[in-house]
């Protein structure tokens, strides 16, 4: 078993091994006293893995209740969040009980925010079942829901007590969800690991799941350990997300998160080339690897619409934005720019 220890406001382990889902209760019991467990999942994942997770938790002595919601970013809203809170209250969950997020990034964000705020905080465990969640969103403690004005506008930092990652669950991933995870993985290689970029170029992610998850989680461990609350170094994880979130919002979330991040990375790198921050070769190699993994690199949404979406980005502070910009494969810099300058950056990135 691969175990990565995360040092944050709450310390915990990320466990990675084929077959761990059936040991979820046993592993959870090592960090959380048996009581009640609330499985929060979307209807797609629950149909695949709900019964096995219940069985594993009950075997370890947990009394299990389940809450499911329709799959997709459209459910990550205040209404579903309130439904989870009502569910916890109706079943008389206490602060000593645990919410188990079974699913991808939407499930983890929503379940984590509910766990963070129900009775001012209760137990929280992550069982990621998508590649994106396994390598990124299940680790680091960011939880949130979307508002009509923008993505992840209401949320909190709330670390889990454990992350249990069974790569076997990735075998049922739809191809588009696999690609989404690959976008985040490529992001990690771009922001700080050139050797990893070469590995991804030569060997498909699906042929090295455990290794890829371990590398990404170790990188995130180091970043979160230095900057848990996103005030400095952790901002580098936003590579591709500034323009990506705008594209995602303009699509009304019909575009998946990883696809939007891929477009965001391509856009900011084009702009970096035009501004002399990085070379043409870096852009060419990034576009090549994104296309190898079947990811988009351009958007047809107009500049005005994307710029309007940028204006509600939660990363804006004091009229400024910290934009993460590639300098070369495995190295980025942070450009602090006025919000109005985002329009010029998008134009330089090929958006019209």
Model feature map: region roles:
Residues 1-97:
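ATP/NTP phosphate-donor binding region
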Residues 106-113, 134-135, 246:
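Short glycine/serine/threonine-rich phosphate/pyrophosphate-binding segments
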Residues 31, 92-94, 117-118, 146-147, ...:
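Solvent-exposed alpha-helices and their adjacent loops that cap or buttress functional pockets
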Residues 198-305:
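Active-site segments that bind and position negatively charged phosphate/pyrophosphate groups
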Residues 15, 113-202:
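A glycine/threonine-rich phosphate-anchoring loop and its flanking beta-alpha core
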Residues 84, 111-115, 185, 247, ...:
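Buried hydrophobic packing segments
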Residues 183-185, 278-352:
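C-terminal charged capping/lid subdomain of soluble metabolic enzymes
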């Amino acid at each position: 078993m691969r175990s990565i220890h995360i040092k944050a406001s709450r310390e915990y382990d990320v466990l990675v091994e084929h077959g761990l889902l059936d040991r979820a209760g046993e592993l959870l019991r090592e960090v959380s006293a048996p009581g009640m467990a609330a499985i929060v999942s979307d209807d797609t994942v629950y149909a695949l893995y709900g019964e096995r997770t219940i069985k594993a938790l009950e075997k370890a002595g947990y009394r299990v209740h389940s809450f499911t919601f329709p799959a997709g970013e459209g459910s990550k809203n205040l209404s579903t969040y309130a439904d989870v809170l009502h569910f916890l209250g109706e079943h008389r969950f206490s602060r000593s009980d645990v919410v188990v997020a079974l699913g991808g990034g939407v499930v983890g964000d929503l379940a984590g925010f509910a766990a963070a705020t129900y009775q001012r905080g209760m137990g929280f465990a992550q069982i990621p079942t998508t590649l994106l969640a396994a390598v990124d969103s299940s680790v680091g403690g960011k939880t949130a829901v979307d508002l009509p004005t923008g993505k992840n506008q209401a949320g909190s930092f709330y670390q889990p007590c454990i992350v249990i990652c069974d790569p076997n669950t990735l075998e049922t991933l739809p191809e588009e969800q696999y690609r989404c995870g690959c976008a985040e993985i490529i992001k990690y290689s771009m922001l700080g690991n050139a050797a990893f970029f070469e590995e991804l170029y030569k060997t498909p992610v699906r042929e090295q799941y455990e290794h890829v998850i371990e590398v990404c989680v170790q990188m995130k461990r180091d970043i979160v350990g230095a900057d848990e609350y996103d005030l400095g170094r952790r901002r580098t994880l936003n590579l591709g997300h500034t323009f990506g979130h705008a594209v995602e919002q303009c699509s009304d979330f019909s575009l998946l998160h990883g696809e939007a991040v891929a477009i965001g990375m391509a856009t900011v790198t084009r702009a970096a080339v035009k501004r002399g921050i990085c070379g043409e070769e870096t852009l060419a190699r990034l576009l090549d690897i994104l296309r190898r993994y079947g990811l988009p690199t351009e958007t047809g949404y107009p500049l005005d619409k994307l710029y309007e979406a940028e204006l509600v980005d939660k990363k804006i502070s004091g009229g400024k934005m910290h934009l993460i910009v590639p300098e070369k494969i495995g190295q980025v810099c942070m450009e602090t720019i006025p919000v109005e300058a985002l329009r010029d950056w998008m134009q330089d990135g090929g958006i019209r």
